[in-house]
């Protein structure tokens, strides 16, 4: 008998259509009467099982009641006749107990507990640890660490009341050396070493303790070995003495080694930063997109005279250098090239070195804005005869200087500003030539004048 399983909303009306497909098998169609409310309904889905067949025979058993999917998160109902559910491990009660166990486990983990929950049978250990801290503040309790954990703890408090009698045990120092061994545990013996301990500080403590105090300072790595030797060999003869100093000596050297480790680690091989610094010293100053800078030659006497006139006017940026070169030839005579005629294809410029740039000879009688020579004359190169733009031409139609092509500028600089000259910024005197130059061409930036 074909069986169909459906999940329908409660309180809804559906059209149930049973048909036979082309193969002959029954087909079931369930269409909601209100398709829009089918999507917006908040009622829970009800599982249905539909058997398609004849009415003869025994009806099928009813399906078991559906179990809520959130049963594990619900409290077990007191009215539930089967609290453990159909399966022992999946019922509401079993799931609630499992959640409780897991919550307890998480809390124990957060508190630092590890492992399973076991009855803490050996609770005497924490009590013994509690008794020890109360005893150590007094010096006579040091030998109690060597003795077993049960009996001697009760006896040390008794000799603590005995210290006012240091005189009688004077003949017993040799006997006390044999008393501390473990085989002898009577209550009468512990007081005798405790009484002798009060006398020994005046006799024996000053001699062994000073070297032990100096050892950790002088030999920090070896000090860890010295306490071990004092604890192993003199346990029998001087049990109370080496115990107390060794405990104090083991503590200070521990922070010392870490403090001494960083200094040797610091002087390591020179880091790569040193190499980068050396490289930075050789790099030219200025923006990275400028051409390489050449060292200026030693200025001659004639250059020094002209440099005194043009000082402060060669600091302008390279955008207007070409125009200034054109204007520098107006007031003076014809240009006389340098003796060396071999010139590179693209002259090297120095935007930073402005004070060392001279005019070669006293060609500029009038100090004006045209006294800046941007070319770096490392090899006395004659750049004016390279390009035709250096030929004498009228200042009415200035052209873009070929010394600074558009390709050399970063994208942030507008090539339209190449025609401007910045040499007038450093002017301090008036010259008829400078006024004529800037009156004709409009400038975007104000020109400081003394008018």
UniProtKB/Swiss-Prot annotation:
Chain spans, region SMARCB1/INI1 binding: 1-176
GO biological process: symbiont-mediated perturbation of host cell cycle progression; symbiont-mediated suppression of host innate immune response; symbiont-mediated suppression of host translation initiation; symbiont-mediated suppression of host type I interferon-mediated signaling pathway
Compartment annotation: Host nucleus matrix
Region described as Disordered: 52-78, 148-451
Motif PXLXP motif, interaction with host ZMYND11 per record, residues: 347-351, 401-405
Region (6.5 X 2 AA tandem repeats of R-G): 311-324
Keyword field contains Transcription: yes
Molecular-function GO term, any one: protein serine/threonine phosphatase inhibitor activity
Compositionally biased region (Pro residues): 154-193, 252-273, 285-299
Chain intervals with Basic residues compositional bias: 310-330
Function per UniProt: Plays a key role in the activation of the host resting B-cell and stimulation of B-cell proliferation. Acts by up-regulating the expression of viral EBNA1-6, LMP1, LMP2A and LMP2B genes, as well as several host genes including CD21, CD23 and MYC. Activates transcription by acting as an adapter molecule that binds to cellular sequence-specific DNA-binding proteins such as host CBF1, SMARCB1 and SPI1.
Protein name in the entry: Epstein-Barr nuclear antigen 2
Source organism of the structure: Epstein-Barr virus (strain GD1) (HHV-4)
């Amino acid at each position: 008998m074909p069986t169909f399983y459906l999940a329908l909303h409660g309180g809804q009306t559906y059209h149930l259509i049973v048909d036979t497909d082309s193969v002959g098998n029954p087909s079931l169609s369930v269409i909601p009467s209100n398709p829009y409310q089918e999507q917006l309904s908040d009622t829970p889905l009800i599982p249905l099982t539909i058997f398609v067949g004849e009415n003869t025979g025994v009806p099928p058993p009813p399906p078991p009641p559906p179990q809520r999917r959130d049963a594990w998160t619900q409290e077990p109902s007191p009215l539930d006749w089967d609290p453990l559910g159909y399966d022992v491990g999946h019922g509401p009660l079993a799931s609630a107990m499992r959640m409780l166990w897991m919550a307890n486990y998480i809390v124990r983990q957060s508190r630092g507990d590890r492992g399973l929950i076991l009855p803490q049978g050996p609770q005497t250990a924490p009590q013994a640890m509690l008794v020890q801290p109360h005893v150590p503040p007094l010096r006579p309790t040091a030998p109690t660490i060597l003795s077993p954990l049960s009996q001697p703890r009760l006896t040390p408090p008794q000799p603590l009341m005995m210290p006012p009698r240091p005189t009688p045990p004077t003949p017993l120092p040799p006997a006390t050396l044999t008393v501390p061994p473990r085989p002898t545990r009577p209550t009468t013996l512990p007081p005798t070493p405790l009484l002798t301990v009060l006398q020994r500080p005046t006799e024996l403590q000053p001699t062994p303790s000073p070297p032990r105090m100096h050892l950790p300072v002088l030999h920090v790595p070896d000090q860890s070995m010295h306490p071990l030797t004092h604890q192993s060999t003199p346990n029998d003869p001087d049990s109370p003495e080496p115990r107390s100093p060794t405990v104090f000596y083991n503590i200070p050297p521990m922070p010392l080694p870490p403090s001494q480790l960083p200094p040797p680690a610091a002087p390591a091989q020179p880091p790569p930063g040193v190499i980068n610094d050396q490289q930075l010293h050789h790099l030219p100053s200025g923006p990275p997109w400028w051409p390489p800078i050449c060292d200026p030659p030693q200025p001659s006497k004639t250059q020094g005279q002209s440099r005194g006139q043009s000082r402060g006017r060669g600091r302008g940026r390279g955008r207007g250098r070409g125009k200034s070169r054109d204007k520098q030839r107006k007031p003076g005579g014809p240009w006389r090239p340098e003796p060396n005629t071999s010139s590179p294809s693209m002259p090297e410029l120095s935007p930073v070195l402005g004070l060392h740039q001279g005019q070669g000879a006293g060609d500029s009688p009038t100090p004006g804005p045209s006294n800046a020579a941007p070319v770096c004359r490392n090899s006395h190169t004659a750049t004016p005869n390279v390009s035709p733009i250096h030929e004498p031409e009228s200042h009415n139609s200035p052209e873009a200087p070929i010394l600074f092509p558009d390709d050399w500028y970063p994208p942030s600089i507008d090539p339209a500003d190449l025609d401007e000259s910045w040499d007038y910024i450093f002017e301090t005197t008036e010259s008829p030539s400078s006024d004529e130059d800037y009156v004709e061409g409009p400038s975007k930036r104000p020109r400081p004048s003394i008018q």
